């Protein structure tokens, strides 16, 4: 059975970059009828917080991304220790005593001599006496995994055939001087023991995957099938990194007031061969989802495109779907008002502002008192309905000789105080005769 995982670190908030990876994994699992695992990568005890973890879970839930299994790496340190001992016993995990300054000096020297800054494996030649000497100085070792030096190859679901020359890589550090684990070993062991079948992640992990495949094999596991998607860039092709704060899922929800399906719709489609569409539910996205459609070129994320998708969703949203959301905002004025204001919405919160045009109080903008008086005089008798606007404006056209913008714009300003907004033919009966007459008389109503 297909089994994938999304493995965020609770050291920060979810943003469009990493949540796109969550979306791809979620859609891939659902399309295959498989299992989606949420793994919390909290081995960095100093920086990981419960607040960030709770935020990650809340953001995913709000987006409609549900998980079938979940666990935290901090509950599995004993398993990582055992795996490290296995690698040590095989001679594949070796201690190194260089300080950060030592390694920087080596890298600078290599680069000055035109060589790639690859770790020279000097630690493999240390004698027991030399190691003891370092220990006596108070140095603690960090531990590196010994790569084979052979090419590692796989067929990537996005990038096609990939070959990584491990001879050109530094042996990766798996354990820090303080005994804490870096990302690599816990991730591999978790993937083995969780029986993950596919790993879908950013292309910045491609080289790292070459090293990880050797660790999979060293621990007696079989490497999953990999798919490395291109990273997100800004609309101008520049990096998003400086803006990840403003592109956090929580901010897009709480500050910008965007709909979850707008974010899902955009992130699932940019960087693919399919056009961006506004999907009302995940089923719509699933129908055409295929990792094979992903481009190897960076996907451009455009804030304005996200807003357009959000607006399209709202313009097509039925009242029964909108009603609970409107109620939370204190903007539920009934189906008739929703139908009137819906075509003008960019965010759901806009509904509250547009509803004020109906409920009032509105301060009318009257630049031509004589025209206001004529408008009041020719307002159709009786209860206003869907035909009243047409009847009214035709009568005014006949009486004043006005037409086009000169006829309509002053009426909009007098009745709404705004130069733009929902259709007046729809608004007029909702405002009602009494408030219309008061506003035409210059009263706030």
UniProtKB/Swiss-Prot annotation:
Keyword terms: Aminoacyl-tRNA synthetase, ATP-binding, Cytoplasm, Ligase, Nucleotide-binding, Protein biosynthesis
GO annotation (BP), single: glutamyl-tRNA aminoacylation
Subcellular locations according to the entry: Cytoplasm
GO function terms (MF aspect): ATP binding; glutamate-tRNA ligase activity; tRNA binding
Binding-site residues, ATP: 242
Protein biosynthesis listed as a keyword: yes
Protein known as: Glutamate--tRNA ligase 1
Organism this protein belongs to: Maricaulis maris (strain MCS10)
Gene it is expressed from: gltX1
């Amino acid at each position: 059975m297909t089994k994938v995982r999304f493995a965020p670190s609770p050291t920060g908030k979810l943003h469009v970059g990493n949540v796109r990876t969550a979306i791809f994994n979620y859609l891939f699992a659902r399309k295959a009828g498989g299992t989606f695992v949420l793994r919390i990568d909290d081995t960095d005890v100093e920086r990981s917080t419960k607040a960030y973890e709770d935020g990650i879970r809340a953001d995913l839930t709000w987006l409609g991304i549900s998980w079938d299994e979940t666990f935290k790496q901090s509950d599995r340190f004993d398993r990582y220790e055992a795996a490290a001992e296995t690698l040590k016993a095989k001679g594949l995990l070796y201690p190194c005593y260089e300080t950060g300054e030592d390694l920087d000096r080596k890298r600078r020297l290599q680069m000055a001599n035109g060589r790639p800054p690859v770790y020279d494996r000097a630690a493999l030649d240390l004698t027991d006496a030399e190691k003891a000497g370092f220990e006596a100085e108070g140095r603690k070792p960090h531990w590196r995994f010994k790569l084979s030096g052979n090419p590692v190859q796989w067929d990537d679901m996005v990038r096609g055939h990939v070959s990584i020359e491990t001879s050109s890589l530094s042996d990766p550090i798996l354990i820090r001087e303080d005994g804490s684990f870096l990302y690599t070993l816990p991730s591999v062991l978790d993937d083995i023991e969780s029986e993950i079948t596919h790993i879908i992640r950013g292309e910045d992990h491609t080289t790292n995957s070459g090293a990880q495949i050797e660790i999979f094999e060293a621990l007696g596991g079989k490497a999953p099938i990999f798919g490395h998607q291109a990273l997100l860039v800004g609309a101008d092709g520049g990096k998003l990194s400086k803006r990840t704060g403003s592109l956090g899922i929580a901010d897009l929800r709480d500050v910008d007031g965007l709909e979850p399906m707008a974010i899902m719709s955009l992130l699932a489609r940019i960087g693919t061969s399919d056009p961006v569409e506004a999907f009302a539910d995940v089923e719509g996205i699933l129908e055409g989802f295929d990792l094979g459609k992903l481009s190897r070129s960076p996907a451009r994320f455009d804030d304005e495109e996200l807003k357009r998708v959000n607006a399209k969703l709202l313009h097509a949203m039925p009242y029964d779907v909108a009603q609970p959301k409107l109620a939370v905002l204190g903007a539920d004025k009934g189906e008739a008002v929703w139908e009137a204001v819906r075509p003008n919405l960019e965010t759901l919160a806009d509904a509250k502002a547009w509803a004020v045009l109906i409920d009032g109080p509105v301060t009318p903008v009257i630049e031509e008192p004589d025209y206001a008086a004529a408008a009041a005089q020719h307002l159709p008798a009786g209860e206003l309905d869907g035909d009243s606007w047409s009847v009214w404006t035709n009568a005014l056209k006949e009486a004043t000789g006005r037409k086009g913008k000169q006829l309509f714009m002053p009426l909009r300003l007098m009745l709404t105080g705004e130069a733009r907004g929902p259709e007046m033919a729809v608004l007029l009966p909702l405002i009602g005769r009494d408030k219309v007459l008061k506003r035409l008389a210059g009263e706030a109503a």
